[in-house]
Structures are given as structure tokens and as C-alpha cells.
């Protein structure tokens, strides 16, 4: 036999080792003894050490890489990793199936049913059959790059089997820690003095986020694939079960417990069987996932917010424990909501120490009759959020009295009130309440809002308590001097230490001024008296002398970075800005819908509440909340202050033409929610007058003569008798006319510059997000699609564009860089 040269031998060893991995981890059919596997692995490792050029990224030797020097970089998921809605009862599952059958017209649709592993969701990206990147789910849109750690998992193939895989393949699945392996690891950890893992799920998540892949490699992690993300169009699927079969063929482990079942009966029977064997499984599961098998049906059902309508997680009953309520305190949120929180004697529930639970509202406390000193049953709903489910009244201590909502806010002393019919009590102090200001600022700077990196909760609390920041606009006036003063005082554990540290930055009369400030707030500089409890806050509130900061004696980089981050946030998108304002009921999805529909902050802040119902999926309650927010002079002043301090919306655009159908008189009458005015009656009334103010002039007799039924006619005339309603109608009509004037006229709609064009975006844009770019392009008539084909009009390519750019070149698709995109958008804005 002719000896193989090193390159041939290395290739042969890689092939045999990868084949062995596939049979061992996927098929559970070992082909070679462990000793033979180890021998081949050592031989390949030696070859690659001798000939470094022979090492390849997919080599079995690369499963343990080099230590990562810094924290993980962010990865933006091409296809979002959606969360699932939960079902906690049989009726919820029946309702889930009913919605699908009603929409699709099938009596017993097929579902893929599988255990919901209690691990960490990840996305694996393969290009030309080679594993190139792995990321955590993160927030569903952006995750962390954990490629090096995922290479250490023997159950994740580095190179795909077969040759039927697509050019680009994203595989979605769960990294988990088998329970026997978890227990064995903890046994060894105790013997060696290592930190033991709290539970398998935390063990999996923590292991995957180690900065050193060698540590990850020591942890007993496994992987199951359950779906796909981005896939190039050279492979087509019709059913989810086909996807799972292909994943198995390509080398991915897929749960052997996955079954194809039919109708609600099939789902519930599967759930019962899995519930019975749950404790015998070698891994933790917290429920069952049901997915509609037919992919065309999935497309028809669509999505709601961040979850698909064609899938649901049927959760098992959570684990429960008993503990004692030590106190009931009130927490004030950013909207003033006063939420009672029970402080508990610490207890372990499903592997997590629970010390407090939210009691939601006063009605919930009254329903459960929770009292201080009670023994309560605590469970983790969905194995995530702790909650009190019952009180053991037989164990109630003598003298325990029923709890009632305090009349005053524990933070600012303002009255706590509840609107008629509402479940939530609120502090009436609004932004005069420091707790609400703190929460409002925390929300404003959060990553998915204005994204001010480096401004943490503790810093926000100090800025508000020290009266440096009174509202979000004050952030844009923060100076280096203010931040360094904050750090100097908070780092000083005693007044004496503050004076000692201050000598590096101030001398003479100014140092004496600082001493006088300390005396003024009650500090005895002799060191004999007691130090006031809040002396640091009182000192920060005082009028300080000027400091000459010695940058060698105090860290300044953090403050400079924070000021730079605040400055960067001045350029933002409309959806981020609206979300950052913290309006009640306005989450990211609603903010995005508002931005897409109206396009301009100047428009949105002037609209009366009924016009917000023109936006898809916004109902009366949400519309009223937005309108109420915008009607408050203090909120309008806050927006003015932000604009005055340089905050600019970078993606403003005209209102979308789809609003036109919502701006008819009949639609306006519907949006006003006048009693007895049904959609059919609104259409009839719209024929009687061209505008709302003119319709208001019609008396009861005129309406009756026009054929309007008595109940509707009387309701309308009574509604218009209110001066407030007349004012609302006039304002509504005026804003409607303004919006209509800014829309493209019907005869010009087809002349939108990108009408009928198909556009793909790839890579990272520096000036605006891809979502903002997509919104701008859609407003100009473009259709945004996810993959490049011969029908693509042009591709917008930012930094790190990936395979879409290669495909665009191959298909001779026109390619725009960011400069060309911005020039085009600016040209249209100018027109």
C-alpha cells in the first residue's frame, strides 16, 4: 500500500472522524471503539501541528479553540428567532387549533409535536456545508457570537453530511445539558472544589457564554435541532417534517420524540404521554411545542408581534414550594403603576432561589387574601416567573390583617389613585415622582430605545436623586464635570475620604468651600459626630466650586464614553424615539407601526386619539393612551426639549398611502366609537355631509328624514351636544385634511420612484438601521424581500454583506452602497 502524503492522510482522518461523530451523536450507532477514535484524533492533531496549513475550520481538532480575549460580539439574525406564545391549559390549546382550522378550512390539520427542551436557543450558520457562525437567540433580533464555544460540542456538525444542503443554511435548535451528565459534572466539581451548577438550564447557558472555549469543552453539553432560519432558495420545503428529515440527513441530531399528530385530540394525547414520561427523560423539558406541519399554512397564518400564529408552547404545570410573606412593598413603574411586591423568606423553586414575587395589583391580593406573615404556595409560571398561587390559611398567624393599598406613594408622597374600572393603581405624581423619572429615563436609554450604552440603573438613580437630571432631555446637557463629581462623591465611603480625594483636584478657597458644603449638610468634620444617612446625595445637590480635575488621579474614560454615547443617540429613528417616550401600551411593535404609517414626529404629536386607530392592530384603548400622552403639555414640552437639544429623526417620510382608506368620513365616524354608530350606519351617515363639522349641524329630524334609525340618530345628536366632542370632531377633521394633503394622490401613486421594484438589504448600515432603511424604501413604493433572485431590482449592501452580495454579483443584480442609498433618499425628501 502506497503511503499517503500528509495532506491526503489529514483529509482521510477528518473524513473518518466526522463519519464517526455522525454515527455516534446523531444515529446513536457507534461504528468504532472510543480508543480508535482517540487514536485517530491524536494523529490528526499531530499532523496539523506539524503542517499548520493543513488545519481547516471544520476539523474535529478545532472543536476546542483559543481563548476569546474579549466579550462576545453581536450577531444580527437574518431571520428573527421568534418566541412562542404559551398555553397553560387544554382550552387554550383547543382555541389555538380552532383559529387554525377556521382560517385554513381543515378539520384536523397535521402538527409537528416535540418536547420543549429547557436549554438555550441558538442559531447555527452554514455556508457551502461548513459551519461558519453560531449565535445565541438574544432578544430574537440580535444575539451573541458564540461560534468558538459551539465548535466544542460534538453533537454540532462542523461539515454537513450528504450533498443536498443549500448554499446558505441557518439551523435553529437548543443547547442543553442532559440531567445525568449535569449530576456527574457537579459530583466532580464538588470533589475538585469547582463551582457547582445550579440547574441544567443555567449550566447550559453559562457554559455557552464562557470566554474560554476550553471551559465550555469541559461541560457536558448536547444539541437538538428543531428548525431553520435563513435558507437560500436552491432547496425547497413544503412541510416542517420534511425540514426535520433533511436536518437528520445533513448530520444534525433531532429529537427522537418528535411526532406528526393530527387535530387537537392528537396534540393533547401527545401532551399526556410526554407528561407521564417527563421525569424519566434524560433531559429537562418544560412543555410541548406544537407547530403546524404545512408550511403554506404557516405562511397563511402569519405572525402576531414577535410570535407565530401557527405554533404554540403547551407548558407543563410549574413546580411549587411553600414559603412565608415577610412584607408587602410597593414598586412604582415608569407610568406610575403601583405594583405590590411580596418579600419572601428565600425558597428554592425549580432550581432558582425566589426572594420576592409580584402580586400584580390590589385586586389580585384581595382575591388571594395575601397577608403579611402568611404561608403561601409559590410556583414559577412557565418555569420562569415566580407567582403566588394560594395562601395556606390554616397556617395564618394570629393578628394578621388584610392588606390595603397605601394612600400615598412611598417615594414622593403623592396620592395613589385608581381610575374607574381600572385594575391598576397609579402614583399621581407623574414626573414629579423620582421613581417614575428614574424608570422613564432607564427605559429611554435602553438598547432598543435610544441605545445609550454605559448609563446603568445605579447612575440613573444618582443623577435623579442628586437633582442633576430632572427629565430625559437633561441627559443631553450632562457635562464631564458633573459625571466626575458624581464618581468622586460615590467612591468616597466617608466625608473624610471625600476631602482627602478632593485635594487632588481643588485647593485653597475652593477646598474650604467644599468643607463648608459638608458642614451645611450636617457633617461634623471633627469626625466625632454621626454621619448623616444621605450625606452623599445632599453634597451632590449643593452648589460646588469649580474643580481642576487631575486626570491622573481620577478615571475619566468612562465619563467621556458616556457623553459620546449620549451624543450619538441624538440621531435616531422615529420608531426608536416613539418607543423611548414610554407611552402606555406602546411597545416596539406599536412604535414601528406608528412610524411606518405616519412617518413624521411633527404629524404624530398633533393627532387626536381617533386617528391612531387608522394604524393596523391599534384599537381604542391603545389609541386613547397615545392621544392622552400627546395631549399633555408636559409631554409636548419634553419632546420640544429633546428637539431643542439636538435629537433628530433620521428616517422621516410622508404618511403611507395605505392610510387613505382610513381617512374617509365613514371611517372617522367608526374611529370615534359613538354608541349605536355601526360600520354600516357610518357609511350611511357619510352620504349626508362631506365633513364631521357639517354632520354635527344636522338635527334629529333631518337625520330621521334621511332614513337614519331612531337609536342611531338620537345617539349621534346627543354625542354632538357635548362641546368637548364638537371640539374633537373639528380637530379630527382638520388633521384628516392635513394628512390627506400629504399623501400621494391616486393618479400619482403609480409614479412612486420604486413602485413595483423588489429590493433586498444585507449587511450593517452606518447611518440608519436596516429596518429604518426598509421603511423609507417601502414608503417610496419598494417591496422588501429577504433573498436575492433574478427578480430583484437592486441590493443595498452595507458592511459585512455575506452571501447575498455574492449571489447578486452572480445574477448581475444592481448593487447600491450606503452612499447611493442615502443620496437617493435625500433626493426624494428634497422633492
Curated annotation (Swiss-Prot):
Catalytic residues in the record: 116 (n6-amp-lysine intermediate)
Binding site for NAD(+): 34-38, 83-84, 114, 137, 174, 291, 315
Annotated ranges, domain BRCT: 749-831
Amino acids binding Zn(2+): 409, 412, 427, 433
Keyword rRNA processing: no
GO molecular function: DNA ligase (NAD+) activity; metal ion binding
Biological processes, Gene Ontology terms: DNA repair; DNA replication
Record-linked Pfam families: BRCT, DNA_ligase_aden, DNA_ligase_OB, DNA_ligase_ZBD, HHH_2, Nlig-Ia
Cofactor(s) this protein cannot do without: Mg(2+); Mn(2+)
Signal peptide: none
Reaction catalysed by this enzyme: NAD(+) + (deoxyribonucleotide)n-3'-hydroxyl + 5'-phospho-(deoxyribonucleotide)m = (deoxyribonucleotide)n+m + AMP + beta-nicotinamide D-nucleotide
Keyword NAD tagged: yes
The EC number(s) this enzyme carries: 6.5.1.2
Top-rank taxon, per record: Bacteria
CC annotations in GO: cytosol
Protein family (similarity comment): Belongs to the NAD-dependent DNA ligase family. LigA subfamily.
UniProt function note: DNA ligase that catalyzes the formation of phosphodiester linkages between 5'-phosphoryl and 3'-hydroxyl groups in double-stranded DNA using NAD as a coenzyme and as the energy source for the reaction. It is essential for DNA replication and repair of damaged DNA.
Protein name (Swiss-Prot/TrEMBL): DNA ligase
GN (gene name): ligA
